[in-house]
Amino acid sequence: MTSKIKSSNTLLTFDANEVTNIKLVWDIEELKNKDKEDKAHIKDEEEDEDGPVSFHPSFSHQIFNDEQVQGYEACKIDIYMGAGSLTSYIDTNYTLQSKNLTNVEGELLKVFSKQDPPISKQSFYKFIEEKEKSFKPIGKKIHEYTITDKESGEETEYEVYFGRITDQAVFRYHEKLQIFVLWYIDGSSYIWTDDPNWDIFFIFEKRIIDGEKRYGITGYSTIYNFYHHPEQTRARISQYLILPPYQRMGHGKYLFNSIHQYYKTNDGFYGPVYDVTIEDPADDFNLLRNYVDLKNIIDEKLFDNVILDLNANNKSVFEEIRKKLLVPHKQSKVCLEIYLFSKFLATPNSNPKYKEFRIAIKKRLYKQNIGDSEQIEKMKQQVAQENEDNLRLEQEELQELQDIENKKNGTNIKVAINTKELTTPSEPEKSKEEIEKDRLEEIIQLYKDLEENYHKTLSSLNLITK
């Protein structure tokens, strides 16, 4: 490695997220400026705008145990990647040859692209200088948009591209890109790319450097195509990520709308797309989804004929929304909840209609959350009973075999039964009243959280004052 860091005899432990720096490099000048900073001993957090964009991962537990790196010297992990090509170079002093306990380089190589693994520093510098500028976005361009910086007024152009995993260029590029989901989506895993049902949408930033167009990755989403009878496709968003330097800028809504717009006019794997669903969305993604879906519904005036009652039959309205916007019925109901909530904001809590509205939502939350937990508890009890029955059966069979041996030998030996006692709760069992009270408190908290999220969505849509 190029840097020399003083070692000690004391075992040190480092937070893997804090010591890892991911750097997106657009141009060789950024690397030259970085080298000057290194010589001047300037720390990463003191970098000026002339160096590469640098940021830390949010998660690393799928790469390093407990998100920790252990060794006998200060840990350095700098991961350089071409902003567009994602060609990479790992600069770390925790290698297989070092005496440190964690082989950082080895662990990272396990999760990086196998077709395009990290290269040496010399090769990386040469690639950035000679080839990075020739990188072109992968797939088919389907949309473009401009974002204006609120402070400087500077406009930046972005382009959205679509590709299928069966396209070898898309497959290979995704293999280099997918490491970001381990760093930024908790509990994520790599998709099974041998399955042809995967679609991928990419966002690229466009810059002009030395009079030439340059492109850098901004974010992406993976979509799985499910079969929907008859001869239709149900598109499910699986992974959805905007890279840290581009977050809180509005890219999420542009990508979300681009996905829906594409599938409205293009077939999925099995035929026309029936709707677009989400796989296990996080809270932040739900906020984005609710904002975009409700805005589109209002812009298309699709709630103009809706019955303002959660208990009413609005199936025909929801079906029209699905056909025009590819929003599933269930999500349309959520949007209706938010829309109705805006109508009751200036209404006293004692208002009968508002009271009915709150009760209807709490009933849904109860069924959605408590109902599921009751089912899980029943399943746990069934499994425990099955295990107990199986254990008893094994013990009986064992005793029968021993009885046969006893008769042969004229002895009377009893098998030492290895009974497995059921674990008793450490606390006294709660009464039905106490259990129900806990459940109601849970629902009340869920409702409060829901109200807060609905407020955020309505504020974003300027339907209420922040």
UniProtKB/Swiss-Prot annotation:
Active site: E279 (proton donor/acceptor)
GO CC list: chromosome, telomeric region; histone acetyltransferase complex; nucleus
Keyword match Manganese: no
UniProt-annotated binding residues for acetyl-CoA: Y240, L241, I242, Q247, R248, M249, G250, H251, G252, K253
Catalytic class of the enzyme: transferase
Molecular function via GO: histone H4 acetyltransferase activity
Site (Interaction with histone H4 N-terminus): W198
EC number(s) given by UniProt: 2.3.1.48
Coiled coil: 372-459
BP GO terms, sorted: subtelomeric heterochromatin formation
Matching Gene3D superfamilies: 3.40.630.30, Histone acetyl transferase 1 (HAT1), N-terminal domain
Domain N-acetyltransferase residue range list: 169-366
Keywords carried by this UniProt record: Acyltransferase, Coiled coil, Transferase
Catalytic activity: L-lysyl-[protein] + acetyl-CoA = N(6)-acetyl-L-lysyl-[protein] + CoA + H(+)
Family per record: Belongs to the HAT1 family.
Record-given protein name: Histone acetyltransferase type B catalytic subunit DDB_G0275159
Species the sequence originates in: Dictyostelium discoideum
